[in-house]
Amino acid sequence: MSKTVHVIGAGISGLAAAIRLARAGLTVHVHEAMQQAGGRCRSYFDAQTGLVIDNGNHLLLSGNHAACEYARTIGTEAGLVGPERAEFDFIDLPANARWRLKLGGGKLPLWLFDANSRVPDTSIGDYLGLMPLLWAPTTKLIGDTINCSGPLYDRLVAPLLLAALNVDPPEGSAGLAGAVVRETLLAGGKACRPLIARDGLSAVLVEPAVAQLAARGPGVQFGHELRALTPAGDRVGALQFGGEDVVTLGPDDAVVLAVPPRPAASLLPGLKTPQEYRAIVNAHFNYAPPPGMPALTGVIGGVVEWLFAFPNRLSVTISNGDRLVDAPREQLAAEIWGEICKIAGISANLPPWQIVRERRATFAATPAQNALRPGPVTQWRNLYLAGDWTDTGLPATIEGSVRSGNRAADLVLAAGRA
């Protein structure tokens, strides 16, 4: 069993690995280059709106078993809130049409047989047309696998896959899309109940993990950026953090490298990583939602794609947002607010707002970029990779992050037992 494990990076994948290892009884040191944990999944106080906001609006589903188990392990599962049933409200802005997708509460997609539960103007046959995704390889395009037109595609498949893959769906990997469909629509309503970190991502998924790690051992050291790895034969022998700050590894010690692909490639020359990334744009408005407004609304035909109603604010998410990263902020905020007023049925002047543009939010989930994702094992027998950009079998999601951290931790534990 490894005596000590050094986890490099305190994003979700790093925290998941660290929690799993610490609970297994190992001494775990977490080294984070920034002054805050969470990576791209974090909250902070924004002076412009006067609110604590998330850098991105992340949606979990009840079928995200790894993420939900992670929250349960750190004692915050109750902080993931959502409706009792798997129901999603949608609005088609150009058609001025609203509907509610009702996925039921079972393990089978029986909702497909109820016209009142399906997307309007769709038949069971339309959904059967998605079946080729289930056995498609990751090397195949979605656009070459299913029909990318019609009511079902426009009103459900496109928004679902756009949010999951963060690329225009026809150019996305059919295999990754198939994984999403298998774990959501095909898994029945029991797996599709939407869950939101109502009190913020940091409060629910990050800070409790940091506190638990501190209670169990050395915890997280912030502002501690790994500068180089020193090899010793077929293993990593030392970690260099700059100057004389060097950590020498014992013969049974291990390292989990849970950093973004750029620093990972810098630390491991020759490591192949995805090279193309796509932006996600989020906007937050200091305006309490009207009574009875759904916590989540999918939007068709607008700039807004998903509208989140938090107790004290309205927030939107726009995926594959490269086209908006250089748009004038004031103009973009006004355009988004105008759509929010239509969606929420309100009439109000533009409230205090903030635009958050994550330019490299996720790797582009295309066949070519997916092929560049590395597995967790490296050329060094005591060094393992974690991150949503590694080869998890899923797009870049919180669920993928947690699974990758768990996988790296399990490899460390297995090596210790060998």
UniProtKB/Swiss-Prot annotation:
Known function: Involved in the biosynthesis of the hopanoid precursor squalene (SQ) from farnesyl diphosphate (FPP). Catalyzes the third (last) step, the reduction of hydroxysqualene (HSQ) to SQ.
Enzyme Commission code(s) on record: 1.17.8.1
Pfam families to which the protein is assigned, alphabetical: Amino_oxidase (PF01593)
SUPFAM superfamilies tied to this protein: FAD/NAD(P)-binding domain
GO MF annotation: an example: oxidoreductase activity
NCBIfam families hit by this protein: HpnE (TIGR03467)
Alphabetical list of Gene3D superfamilies matching this protein: FAD/NAD(P)-binding domain (3.50.50.60)
Reaction catalysis annotation: squalene + FAD + H2O + H(+) = hydroxysqualene + FADH2
Organism of derivation: Rhodopseudomonas palustris (strain ATCC BAA-98 / CGA009)
Keyword set includes Acyltransferase: no
Ranges that cross the membrane: none
First-level EC class: oxidoreductase
Pathway: Secondary metabolite biosynthesis; hopanoid biosynthesis
Keywords, in A-Z order: FAD, Flavoprotein, Oxidoreductase
Protein name in the entry: Hydroxysqualene dehydroxylase
Family: Belongs to the HpnE family.
